[in-house]
Amino acid sequence: MTLPKDKLFLSEQTWRWYGPDDPVSLWDIKQAGATGIVNALHHIPNGEVWTVEEIMKRKELIESVGLKWSVVESVPVHEHIKTQTGNFRKYIENYKESLRNLGQCGIHIVTYNFMPVLDWTRTDLAYTLPDGSKALRFERAAFIAFDLFLLKRPGAETEYTDEEKTKARIRFEQMDEKEKQLLVRNMIAGLPGSEESFTLEQFQHELDRYRGIDAEKLRTHLIYFLKEITSTADEAGVKLVIHPDDPPCSILGLPRIMSCAEDFQALIDAVPNESNGLCLCTGSLGVSCANDLEGMMRRFGDRINFVHFRSTQRDAEGNFYEANHLEGDVDMYHVMKAFLELQQRRKVSIPMRPDHGHQMVDDLKKKTNPGYSCIGRLRGLAELRGLEMGIAKSIF
């Protein structure tokens, strides 16, 4: 099948930018070849309205270098909404107002997640790979050691096997005080994309809010939230895209409800509004060997409005690290092929971004946001761009 060049739909190449304080500048991003920016107003506290004035100020800054604010990632969902406590109805109304304002300002894709307390979780933010570059890693024994011996979460010991607890004890005894404190910081101290950071005591208090909230109840709260806001999103021309759980399993006793194809299907069935869409993150979902990423791309293609391309290398013990974008356990060729075919079928260029990247080359000497250094993502974007173009040239 041959498509005329002007009829070929390739992805919109985007880049996550953390605003004026990001060490990676808009000019850096432009030189990387991205055309769209993925951004959020991190200076606005969770739950408050994003005003037209604040949105336009940021949009004009992005456009001043010839880039486009393509995707919001994220408008955070307040914890009161997730637990349906306190001022949750007020925060839902504020969320609606933010969606109206974003639509009015011409920004039409809004990412969010419904993960309790934590955004994404890693135990090591500077795992050294054989080539000397650094990646993000999740080590299960260290994670359990944090839960049992540092956080000392009530009832945690019942959630792990005897073998896991023994490995965690050995791992904990190997740590010196500096390593223990680093693990605590890595686990709970506001990673990029997380809007809150906590002391251990505050963190446990936040976990306690979810006592009595299992996966079924949290899903009910998510569906309630979406039924409240999707009509507003429809009217504003905004597509909501939910990010999957990272990692896609229960952690610290917290429920997870966006971890697999069945979770996606349940959400679409419950809230069929056109604005109820998905962010397919191959890195988050790829941690579970049960997730067929190519199949999910094809099955949910009409709902996928944003894609994160990332690969992970996992092992049998539940550990994983973030691999190079074209390596690891994700079959990026077939996922990209399905993505490319989806865009031709829908006749649309869908935003994608290289999700995370290794800290490498010059960035090893710099202070960077974990996972969001420049050169590793530049490499990832170049590889993904080449893969997409190569597939397109070979089949269209």
UniProtKB/Swiss-Prot annotation:
Q: Which Gene3D superfamilies match?
A: Divalent-metal-dependent TIM barrel enzymes (3.20.20.150)
Q: Which Pfam families match?
A: UxuA
Q: What cofactor requirement does the entry state?
A: Fe(2+); Mn(2+)
Q: Which reaction does it catalyse?
A: D-mannonate = 2-dehydro-3-deoxy-D-gluconate + H2O
Q: Which GO terms describe its molecular function?
A: ferrous iron binding; manganese ion binding; mannonate dehydratase activity
Which pathway features in its UniProt record?
A: Carbohydrate metabolism; pentose and glucuronate interconversion
Enzyme Commission designation: 4.2.1.8
One GO biological process term = D-glucuronate catabolic process
Q: Which UniProt keywords apply?
A: Iron, Lyase, Manganese
Please indicate if the UniProt record lists Magnesium as a keyword.
Answer: no
- Xref: PANTHER family: MANNONATE DEHYDRATASE (PTHR30387:SF2)
NCBIfam families (UniProt xref): PRK03906.1, uxuA
Annotated function: Catalyzes the dehydration of D-mannonate.
Q: What is the protein's given name?
A: Mannonate dehydratase
